[in-house]
């Protein structure tokens, strides 16, 4: 199901048909370095991973979405996540290396912000990012998000930067 469209992009719900793309994205060295190793090494692992976003659509009315160009080429994922460890919804995104530095993440994230504000009526949005991920930090700042504090996820010892923006 298509959720959002921008000038260049379509954001749609992930499906089990997206296993090959998810397998490639989650094994990209930058994904593993900056976001984390999800231990997705096979098509079956990718199917299991995809159940998370699919269940989030049903439970929350949002989740991580596939980002495609107008030709239908998968570029990355972007969307909204509700984590038990955070007080508010956060935004997440990741793109294949060949589609970075072309403004796609900014465009997809901007559309996700508008969805969070206008459709979900959220007043605040968070983002968590590795302190070493300079490109992602610059993107969050360009989107108007402000650094609030360092944050550690439960069951993880890596400190992350927590960013926030008021949408209302």
Feature map (PLM): residue ranges:
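A short helix-loop-beta-strand connector motif used in the catalytic cores of GNAT acetyltransferases and
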Residues: 54-66
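Short glycine-enriched, charge-decorated loop/helix-capping segments at active-site entrances
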Residues: 37-40
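Short amphipathic alpha-helix in the helical subdomain of ABC transporter nucleotide-binding domains
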Residues: 42-46
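Acyl-donor (CoA/ACP) binding surface of acyl/acetyltransferases
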Residues: 1-34, 51, 66-168
């Amino acid at each position: 199901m298509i959720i959002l469209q921008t000038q260049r992009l379509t954001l749609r719900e992930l499906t089990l048909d997206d296993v090959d793309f998810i397998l490639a994205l989650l094994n990209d060295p930058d994904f593993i370095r900056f976001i984390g190793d999800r231990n997705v090494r096979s098509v079956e692992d990718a199917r299991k991973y995809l159940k998370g976003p699919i269940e989030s659509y049903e439970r929350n009315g949002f989740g991580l979405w596939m980002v495609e160009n107008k030709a239908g080429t998968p570029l990355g994922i972007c969307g909204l996540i509700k984590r038990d460890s955070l007080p508010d919804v956060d935004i997440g995104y990741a793109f294949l290396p060949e589609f970075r530095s072309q403004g796609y993440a900014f465009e997809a994230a901007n559309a996700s912000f508008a969805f969070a504000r206008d459709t979900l009526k959220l007043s605040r949005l968070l983002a968590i990012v590795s302190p070493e991920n300079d490109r992602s930090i610059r993107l969050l700042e360009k989107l108007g998000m402000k650094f609030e504090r360092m944050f550690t996820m439960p069951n993880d010892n890596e400190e992350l930067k927590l960013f926030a923006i008021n949408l209302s």
